[in-house]
């Protein structure tokens, strides 16, 4: 479905969260890509953080941003695989008030178009 060009563009303030036990500011390519894309699309970077694969740490960072009026959206990368250390979805469930039914399926379908069956390795 195309974007409705008659609607005004409304930029949002986005916080980028990288969840990883190994990434640092110098090698967080996924976080860098997200920042580049949000800026090129006209949005603002509200904040950025890298946290370990620990549910309490993730929740703490999310709560900080949820309570920050200068953050409209949080986009996360990492910690969504199927290993025991991948706990990002569970951490998000602890702070989310509403689920968006179908979003995960749509995201995986779009991913499947690009990376094939490897998309099943992400939740």
Stretches with model-predicted labels:
Residues 1-123:
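Non-catalytic beta/alpha edge segments that cap or flank active sites
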